[in-house]
């Protein structure tokens, strides 16, 4: 089965972001790339001079997520990254296929920037953090000279950070680690920015994901909202400021 469609630039105009560093964006369960691109319209505007945001569709058909039909009822089909929210061992190959398809399509659209980060909401945030842990494991094995290849994303394992909107813990096992090591026994050490809505019913589970990350490399942005992507200027500005601060500290390298 072919991976579902991706979403990048959706018109034929010249795109000034093609040479910028790229951030792969993973939607929440029960939405899709097109919806997530719209939900991220304010953060995209804040970062438009610094990053190109590219939106991928999850591999699994899904019913619409909470409150999705009220605004986006005609924007289906809806997708998910996991076949069921309770899944602990995801279908890594299908996730990798969707990510690789979105990346390849963006290359064909003329984009040339390095893939420097991940950005996800809800289920997509959990998957994004888990992908970052997989990369960390792979890098640790490389340092130990064990030489390990782990699938479709082996050649694109240079993410520098992840922005995690309302992502739940614990981390998922995406592979690239010791067969006897579960992700809950490890801390994610690569830089993460956690965005929590203080009125979100799942807030404590989002704090679980924060606790899965090394304190010195995890940043927290809190805003007075529920389970959605913030769009108020002051809330989004706080997230964008954290991303720009990472860049100013050299986290993003030359990409």
Curated annotation (Swiss-Prot):
Active site: 122 (charge relay system), 200 (charge relay system), 227 (charge relay system)
Biotechnology (record note): Azasperpyranones display potential anti-cancer activities. Azasperpyranones A, C, D, and F exhibit potent growth-inhibitory activity against the A549, HepG2, HCT-116, and HL-60 cell lines, with IC(50) values of 2.39-14.42 mm, respectively. Moreover, azasperpyranone D significantly inhibits HCT-116 xenograft tumor growth in BALB/c-nu mice. In addition, azasperpyranones A and C can bind with four kinds of therapeutic targets for cancer, eEF2K, FGFR, survivin, and TNF-a.
Documented EC number(s): 3.1.2.-
MF-aspect GO terms: hydrolase activity
Family label: Belongs to the LovG family.
Function text: Probable esterase; part of the cluster B that mediates the biosynthesis of azasperpyranones, members of the azaphilone family that exhibit anti-cancer activities. Azasperpyranones are synthesized by 2 clusters, A and B. Cluster A is responsible for the production of the polyhydric phenol moiety while the azaphilonoid scaffold is produced by the cluster B. The non-reducing polyketide synthase ATEG_03629 produces 5-methyl orsellinic acid, which is then reduced to 5-methyl orsellinic aldehyde by the NRPS-like protein ATEG_03630.
Protein name: Probable esterase ATEG_07663
Lineage, opening ranks: Eukaryota, Fungi, Dikarya, Ascomycota, Pezizomycotina
